């Protein structure tokens, strides 16, 4: 998704078009700050949570289509703080995770309030650990068992092309070490400062990336693999 800078209306239109192209699915994943681009200085760009057009659209989409949809938004919460909030929206529920590892190299920590702990969202029997961009570099935070028990990790990102190799490598590492599926969704295009190459991927628990950006995640296959090769029993 090539995000239009600071334009939720245009990005909602674009998200709708991409979803139509993807076809029917149980879960759709959008990038980090998909409605605005990566707004380091959120004043005048971030939406108020109570009146967010992007969040309202996510709620409506989930309800109308009977699907789940997730992605992060630059949000001002009712306490007046800005948060990089990863929403997981289903027809009947909204779960959110506030990005814990704020990107100090880009001054994100100067404007946003971090979350305290991992969050797991459940949908159609599958447990998804919600993560955002820079979190990918910190394996202890997402460690299976320590972060909770889950079946898949979702990383939404604005990960620059200059560090693309790290993105590709770490997605596979998180899948292998936690014996789980990993869904990594990164934006494409340009913002005022950075180029983004994309590289979105769906990675199997053995580290193999799908040839398509649409995939079926099998709880049965995951359970059999974990039972046969019990790496998680020996985790730190």
Give the location of each predicted region:
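Hydrophobic residues at beta-strand termini and immediately following loops
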Residues: 1, 97, 121, 185, ...
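Short polar catalytic/cofactor-binding loops
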Residues: 1-7
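Cys-nucleophile CN-hydrolase/nitrilase-fold catalytic domain and related Cys-dependent amidase chemistry
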Residues: 8, 16-90, 96, 161, ...
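Short, acidic/polar
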Residues: 10-19, 137-143
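Active-site catalytic loop in hydrolytic enzyme cores
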Residues: 47, 77-148, 162-163, 169, ...
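CN hydrolase (nitrilase-like) catalytic-core segments centered on the catalytic cysteine
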Residues: 53-70, 137-213
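Binuclear metal-dependent phosphoesterase catalytic core
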Residues: 204, 208-233
């Amino acid at each position: 998704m090539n995000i239009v800078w600071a334009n939720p209306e245009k990005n909602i239109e674009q998200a709708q078009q991409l979803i139509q192209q993807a076809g029917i699915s149980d879960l759709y994943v959008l990038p980090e700050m998909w409605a605005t681009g990566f707004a380091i200085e959120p004043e005048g760009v971030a939406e108020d949570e109570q009146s967010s057009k992007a969040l309202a659209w996510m709620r409506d989409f989930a309800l109308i289509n009977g699907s789940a949809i997730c992605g992060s938004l630059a949000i001002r919460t009712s306490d007046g703080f800005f948060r990089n909030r990863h929403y997981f929206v289903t027809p009947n529920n909204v779960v959110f995770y506030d990005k814990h590892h704020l990107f100090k190299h880009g001054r994100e920590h100067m404007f946003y309030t971090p979350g305290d702990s991992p969050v797991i969202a459940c949908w159609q029997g599958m447990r998804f650990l919600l993560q955002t961009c820079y979190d990918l570099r910190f394996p202890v935070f997402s460690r299976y068992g320590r972060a909770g028990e889950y079946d898949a990790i979702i990383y939404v990102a604005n990960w620059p092309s200059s560090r693309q190799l790290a993105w590709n490598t770490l997605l596979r590492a998180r899948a292998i070490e936690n014996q789980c599926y990993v869904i990594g969704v990164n934006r494409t295009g340009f913002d005022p400062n950075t180029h983004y190459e994309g590289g979105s991927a769906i990675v199997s628990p053995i580290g193999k990336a799908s040839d398509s950006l649409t995939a079926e995640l099998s709880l049965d296959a995951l359970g059999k693999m974990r039972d046969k090769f019990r790496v998680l029993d020996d985790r730190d």
